[in-house]
Amino acid sequence: MTTSAPPSPSTSSSYTHVADLPVHLTRFIGRDHELTELSRLIGATRLLTLTGAGGSGKTRLAREVAAAHAGRYARIGWVDLAPITDPVSIAREVATALHIPDRGGRPAEALVETIADSTMLLVLDNCEHLVDAAAELAEQLLRACPRLSILATSREALGIPSETAWLVPPLGGAEAAQLFVERAQASLPAFELTETNSSAVRDICRRLDGIPLAIELAAARVR
């Protein structure tokens, strides 16, 4: 499979504009440098995989990247693979999530026929337990659908030729502290960073290696 940049949006696509993105009730904090870098990469590769440990913020970052670039695509489809346990069913589950009818038990073919030359961004979230199946489906779709781009999240890369794998870094000290404070305020609205507690907050974030989920869980215990 050859490497090429995603094409410009097409107005002739029959696959109408829909942005099926998850809704988060908390504010996205920081990651300005990461968003800038990923904005460059998503415009230069057709398969971008965000990798990293659980809780590192892959899903949230993917959501923000997709939302920021919604105008590039006729459609954005988001598929959470976490509930899928059978690798054989991945094509059917993806088709179902995208509201594409399973045509005679051939879900992969139905995906190809429906997406066709649509300018689409497909987000495959939580691929790690289905890496081989996700890689096979992604490669099949990319080969058959020339205007399709895929943004994946996984604890490990899919291993497809021309894939760009990008390791999500931990939050920096200031961003980690800001996240802690905002999440702590959900349970204790009066909480704020002060000269008295700032050292302790930063120490907690450092001990948690800047992992967003771990910081959020710790902040939720503030009373």
Language-model features: locations:
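Aliphatic-rich helical/repeat scaffold segments used for oligomerization and domain docking
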Residues: M1-R223
